[in-house]
């Protein structure tokens, strides 16, 4: 099966080499950095409720993806085959594709919100192109992408089914209870990845995978690291806890106003988000130990809380937004 998938990737790269820049563009549309730029734009400047839903869903989806990668612990194409060209490098396992999964959850939720047939067609095209881009870049097998689509669809459907009843129950809790639920949920999400790693026992990454990755991309791999799991769970906690403080009776976020004001709001908010992210990043050691895990969690939680609560409060103070 792997040989067939490698042959498919090789043929795709050979027959459509001119598509490289386009494929890199669509791959970026599935990057975590893209979501970190777009979700605040919805939350601060367009539709706070949709931004809130997107932030919560992407945090849950990201944490689930990290756990599933460890459960399956399968390689990426360029780790195992010299016949493909590595147009990207990633240290984590390959299946399921986080880009494919994230594309379905992110764009699918927006499409469910917009409810226009033409938008659904556009979303399906974007999702498929993101998946194809990952195969073209040789960072995923076709099976990785297909499973990512399936997991993303399942996650999205569960979220749509449960967000109403679960959200109403959480909304009836006092603020302390809501923050506790956010903390417990994020730690449970991290625990899933920790438990998945524990099930591997003394399994080790094959030396040939590590050597192949370095040979073909120049970058080392660290698929047994839980750094991404810590980041996903921290973002979920910070974003959810901040929203509990800001939403809805305690002020919320008012996204109306002139577009020039919204632009200033976004630029200021994103600059502070970047300062928080990269400032904390200077404190995080490269080793995969508990200290690094805790600092990654705190870094992500601080960024998430700034987006959902700190920034709206700052906007109101600076007269860039009104309390709603």
Task: Report residues per predicted region.
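Interfacial loop-to-transmembrane junctions
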Residues: 257-261, 288-297
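Long, hydrophobic alpha-helical transmembrane bundles and adjoining juxtamembrane helices/loops
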Residues: 14-17, 41, 238, 301, ...
């Amino acid at each position: 099966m792997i040989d067939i998938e490698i042959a498919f990737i090789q043929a795709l790269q050979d027959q459509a080499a001119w598509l490289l820049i386009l494929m890199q563009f669509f791959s970026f549309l599935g990057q975590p950095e893209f979501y970190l730029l777009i979700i605040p734009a919805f939350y601060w400047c367009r539709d706070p409720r949709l931004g809130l839903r997107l932030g919560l869903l992407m945090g849950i989806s990201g944490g689930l993806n990290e756990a599933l990668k460890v459960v399956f612990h399968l390689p990426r194409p360029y780790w195992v085959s010299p016949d493909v060209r590595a147009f990207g490098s990633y240290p984590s396992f390959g299946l399921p594709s986080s880009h494919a999964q994230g594309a379905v959850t992110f764009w699918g939720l927006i499409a469910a919100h917009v409810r226009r047939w033409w938008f659904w067609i556009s979303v399906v095209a974007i999702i498929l192109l993101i998946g194809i881009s990952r195969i073209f870049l040789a960072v995923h097998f076709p099976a990785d992408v297909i499973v990512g689509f399936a997991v993303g669809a399942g996650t999205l459907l569960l979220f749509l089914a449960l967000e109403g009843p679960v959200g109403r129950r959480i909304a009836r809790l006092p603020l302390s209870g809501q923050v506790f639920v956010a903390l417990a949920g994020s730690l449970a999400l991290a625990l899933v990845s920790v438990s998945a790693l524990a099930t591997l026992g003394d399994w080790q990454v094959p030396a040939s995978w590590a050597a192949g990755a370095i040979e073909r991309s120049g970058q080392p791999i660290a698929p047994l690291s839980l750094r991404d799991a810590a980041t996903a769970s921290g973002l979920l906690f910070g974003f959810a806890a901040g929203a509990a403080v800001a939403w809805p009776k305690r002020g919320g976020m008012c996204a109306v106003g002139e577009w020039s004001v919204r632009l200033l709001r976004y630029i200021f908010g994103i600059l502070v988000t970047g300062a928080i992210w990269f400032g904390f990043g200077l404190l995080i050691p490269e080793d995969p130990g508990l200290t690094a895990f805790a600092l990654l969690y705190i870094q992500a939680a601080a960024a998430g809380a700034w987006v959902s609560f700190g920034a709206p409060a700052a906007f109101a103070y600076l007269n860039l937004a009104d309390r709603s």
